[in-house]
Amino acid sequence: MTKHIVLSSLLLIALAIFGGCRTVPYDTSGQNFAVFQFGEFRMLVNTTAPLTFLAAQKAVQQDDLFKTYEVQNKFEAQILARAHNDQKIRINIEEANSRQTLVRIRWGEGGDQIKSRKLFDMIDANLK
């Protein structure tokens, strides 16, 4: 009986640690990768947080999302929005260093990799 408990516990711990993380190839060259972990899409952009925030605001409008909340500080920002099917979208922007900013997108409660990536692509296009 104790072997089953130990084995079950180890299995649950392994699933919690390794189960929710995927590296997603971002481009066809294989040089850039994004991370989709526990329903959250993460990718770096080569610019500052304020410029990324402006690009994210524009992407929210382009994707016809209803913005419910936004806040911006010097090195970080957050935008909350809703889709037409009432799914909650959260965009977190954090400046990693003076030349790179981390963008984290969660689409819905469980996360949607395809829709999150589409929104990130719009943000990235607005930065160019």
Task: Please annotate each region the language model reported.
Residues 1-9:
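Bacterial N-terminal signal peptides that target proteins for export
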Residues 16-20:
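C-terminal motif of bacterial Sec signal peptides marking the signal peptidase cleavage site
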Residues 12-13:
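Repetitive helical segments and hydrophobic/amphipathic motifs
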Residues 22-128:
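Ser/Thr-rich, low-complexity intrinsically disordered terminal regions
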